[in-house]
């Protein structure tokens, strides 16, 4: 029977019960087990629990150290950007065979009257590799020899929020850690003055919101931290009036001591996270404003990214005040973060959900993204950072070759959700550039060659960072969880 103050009870967590109920060599053995599972941190200076973001070694030699994931929320049309389909010109206005659509669940398309829709875009070849890309992406086209374009990604999720969860966390349900959280859990962070995982947003916001960068059941130290590119980088980071640095330091030291005592009793990793977050916030009061201060960047660099660009008119879903400048600035900040040791940077833009007005709105979004994304790749390469920085462009799914016909429209001006085949591209970080991997059928309905499920993409990403995806696990509620769930196969064709 357990007695005493319930607040101090050794039964307050399963870990504390296991740790305190053992004795002698049993305690040492248990501590070793917890350490192996990542549930018990090594001691830091002065006997304090080590930071959960302390650097750690992967399973084998990594090719990548950092990742910048550009997430175009809403699902860009791969047929109008990355995957040319001349057959759609021939079949424009004709229905697909019923055998291809009878068991398909659409978000909005009415099956009985749905017909194929051509792309008005011109595709041209770029680089020595001859990669075909849309005329909406001339700047990215200039990076073709550094890019691996995958045209055969697929998923089972056809609605935005589940699809975004699938791409960002490996499963289509709430409560699981995101890719950036898994990498910081596995590797720790090389930055002492900035978070290991930073999120930058532009546009109207993704439907998945913060669930896309959550730490899930991992300790909260591994969650993404939302930064703002202008003004106060993180809300409420500054001291309130009247709180000087000496009093602040004394308060933090007192909190650290109290939390360390509690950690010694419970071994709760959330207490480690709390100690680390307080100390990091203190250091970021100086480092975060310095990060977003671009006055030390040359004019040529600012112009390359387009940080002073003016928005185009007719924005549609992807617009917002100063969206061109904001997205460009976010790409530049991502490079500055990688230089400062940030492990994982997410850049979100929304929305690319073009159910209608595809021509106008895709032109707007692509023009916004094309220049700064290409500048990011080129800038990283010029500075010697691309070799160990993985850059990813992706989204939750693609768009249908069928035009969207809801509402009785006489003309189709958009495309519906399409998880059966879509495109992503990667550069740097051990990726073999200048290649196209995968192939879809003649109308872009199914991936038919080198098919790559999202779990396979995640397995490949972890491999580039030195991890066997089946061994990077975290025990939660009696089960070992991993980013790739119960699947995943490394796509070796992508790796140099």
Spans of model-derived segments:
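Ligand-binding pockets and gating/stacking loops
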Residues: 1-496
């Amino acid at each position: 029977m357990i007695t005493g103050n319930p607040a101090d009870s050794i039964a307050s967590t399963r870990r504390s019960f296991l740790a305190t109920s053992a004795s002698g060599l049993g305690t040492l053995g248990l501590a070793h087990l917890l350490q192996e599972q990542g549930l018990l941190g090594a001691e830091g200076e002065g006997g304090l629990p080590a930071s959960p973001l302390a650097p750690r070694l992967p399973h084998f030699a990594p090719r990548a150290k950092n990742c910048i994931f550009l997430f175009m929320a809403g699902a860009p049309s791969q047929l109008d950007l990355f995957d040319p389909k001349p057959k759609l010109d021939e079949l424009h206005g004709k229905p697909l065979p019923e055998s291809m659509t009878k068991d398909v669940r659409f978000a909005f398309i009415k099956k009985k009257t749905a017909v194929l829709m051509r792309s008005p875009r011109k595709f041209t070849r770029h680089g020595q590799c001859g990669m075909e890309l849309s005329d909406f992406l001339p700047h990215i086209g200039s990076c073709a020899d550094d890019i691996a374009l995958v045209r055969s990604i697929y998923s089972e999720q056809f609605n935005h929020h589940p699809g975004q969860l699938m791409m960002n966390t490996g499963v289509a349900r709430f409560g699981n850690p995101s890719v950036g959280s898994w990498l910081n859990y596995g590797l720790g962070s090389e930055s002492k003055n900035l978070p290991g995982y930073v999120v930058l947003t532009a546009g109207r916001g993704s439907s998945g919101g913060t669930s896309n960068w959550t730490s899930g059941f991992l300790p909260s130290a591994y969650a993404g931290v939302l930064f703002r590119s202008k003004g106060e980088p993180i809300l409420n980071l500054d001291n309130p009036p009247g709180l000087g640095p000496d009093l602040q330091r004394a308060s933090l030291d007192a909190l650290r001591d109290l939390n360390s005592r509690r950690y010694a009793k419970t071994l709760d990793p959330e207490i480690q996270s709390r100690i680390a977050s307080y100390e990091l916030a203190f250091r970021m009061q100086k480092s975060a404003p310095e990060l977003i201060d671009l006055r030390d960047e040359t004019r040529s660099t600012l112009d390359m990214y387009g940080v002073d660009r003016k928005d185009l008119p007719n924005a549609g879903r992807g617009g917002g005040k100063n969206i061109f400048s904001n997205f460009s600035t976010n790409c530049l900040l991502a490079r500055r973060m990688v230089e400062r040791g940030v492990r994982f940077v997410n850049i979100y833009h929304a929305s690319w959900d073009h159910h209608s007005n595809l021509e106008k709105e895709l032109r707007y979004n692509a023009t916004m993204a094309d220049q700064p994304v290409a500048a990011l790749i080129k800038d990283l390469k010029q500075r010697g950072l691309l070799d160990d920085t993985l850059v990813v462009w992706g989204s939750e799914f693609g768009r249908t070759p069928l035009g969207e016909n809801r509402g009785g429209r006489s003309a189709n001006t958009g495309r519906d959700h399409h998880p059966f085949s879509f495109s992503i591209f990667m550069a740097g970080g051990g990726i073999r550039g200048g290649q196209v991997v995968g192939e879809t059928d003649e109308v872009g309905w199914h991936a038919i060659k080198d098919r790559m499920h999202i779990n396979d993409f995640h397995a490949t990403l972890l491999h580039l960072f030195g991890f066997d995806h089946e061994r990077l696990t975290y025990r939660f509620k009696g089960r070992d969880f991993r980013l790739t769930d119960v699947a995943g196969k490394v796509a070796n064709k992508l790796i140099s």
